């Protein structure tokens, strides 16, 4: 951004407004933690100034030093020129009310599952007791760590195939003192022999090949391993549905995010009673399904999964 801009902009609000305008003008893509230019510009300004993310509006008229303005504008410039997701620029993403370290070793935390965690997974758990929970495809560890944070009596496993993702998850575990969370390397369930859980939560890769190839530049900074999942986005989901009953208690529950691949799943398995979760903003491609329901339809699920 130009030196002239630094001369004309004076306050926190000035910079937030300017960043919002530039981001919209540049046609940036949002969706990594924030879904609009205003919130993302606010995040970048507050981070640059070492201010809390929930800073009150009374500080909006605070005037800035020239060096502070230049630091903010440099971050804006990178966001526009390089299309780097804001969370990777700041190294931080908020999920379920918690601050996570975020970098290119794993997807930016953004799953709507955060809303379920904060609601105690009700009404889907129906008051049933949980002592052991699994976050399959844990990535940054955000789901596992948030589950452990809000449920200190649970023992939570976070599992991923990526060494890079697990290293980031370990840093987040230490950052948030998640002592009841264990991190394990496994290709889905293959390394979890003998482990059973009352609740399995998973946000696996579910983006179709065509969608992955057409994603905006912002997504190119994320590991493709966490996105691409075959022609219909269900290559991993079907394997999870097949194998989950071996690792769920008799009264266990699976919660899975499939995003835009929801319709593909419904067409493949119309007989399965998937309970599609309604969020504050509507359905987001996340379902809950009982262990006994997966067992009842295991033959068809196994047939589909084996064809992948």
From Swiss-Prot:
CDD domains on file: AdoMet_MTases
Pfam families attached to this UniProt entry: MTS (PF05175)
Signal peptide feature range: none
Keyword list, A-Z: Methyltransferase, S-adenosyl-L-methionine, Transferase
InterPro entries recorded: DNA_methylase_N6_adenine_CS (IPR002052), HemK-like (IPR004556), Ribosome_uL3_MTase (IPR017127), SAM-dependent_MTases_sf (IPR029063), Small_mtfrase_dom (IPR007848)
SUPFAM superfamilies in the cross-refs: S-adenosyl-L-methionine-dependent methyltransferases
GO annotation, cellular component aspect: cytosol
Functional description taken from the UniProt entry: Methylates large ribosomal subunit protein uL3 on a specific glutamine residue.
Name the UniProt record assigns to this protein: Ribosomal protein uL3 glutamine methyltransferase
Gene: prmB
């Amino acid at each position: 951004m130009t030196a002239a801009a630094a001369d004309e902009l004076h306050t926190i609000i000035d910079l937030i407004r300017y960043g919002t305008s530039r981001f919209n003008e540049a046609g940036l893509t949002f969706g990594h933690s924030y879904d609009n230019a205003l919130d993302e510009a606010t995040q970048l300004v507050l981070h640059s100034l070492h201010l809390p993310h929930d800073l009150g509006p009374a500080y909006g008229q605070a005037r800035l030093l020239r060096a502070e303005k230049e630091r903010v504008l440099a971050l804006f410039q990178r966001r526009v020129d390089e299309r780097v997701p804001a969370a990777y620029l700041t190294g931080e993403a908020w999920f379920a009310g918690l601050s996570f370290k975020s970098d290119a070793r794993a997807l930016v935390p953004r799953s709507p599952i955060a809303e379920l965690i904060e609601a105690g997974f009700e009404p889907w758990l129906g008051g049933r007791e949980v002592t052991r929970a699994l976050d399959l495809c844990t990535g940054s560890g955000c789901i596992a760590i948030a589950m452990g944070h809000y449920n200190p009596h649970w023992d939570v496993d976070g599992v991923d195939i990526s060494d890079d993702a697990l290293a980031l998850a370990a840093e987040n575990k230490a950052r948030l003192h998640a002592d009841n969370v264990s991190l394990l390397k496994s290709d889905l369930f293959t390394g979890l022999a003998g482990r059973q859980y009352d609740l399995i939560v998973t946000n696996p890769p579910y983006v179709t090949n065509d969608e992955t190839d057409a994603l905006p530049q912002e997504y190119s900074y994320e590991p493709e391993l966490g996105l691409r999942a075959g022609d219909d986005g269900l290559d991993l989901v079907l394997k999870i549905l097949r194998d989950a009953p071996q690792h769920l208690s008799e009264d266990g529950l699976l919660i899975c995010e499939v995003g835009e691949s929801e319709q593909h799943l419904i067409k493949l398995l119309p007989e399965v009673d998937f309970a599609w979760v309604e969020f504050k903003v509507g359905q987001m491609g996340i379902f809950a399904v009982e262990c006994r329901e997966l067992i009842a339809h295991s033959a068809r699920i196994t047939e589909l999964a084996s064809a992948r």
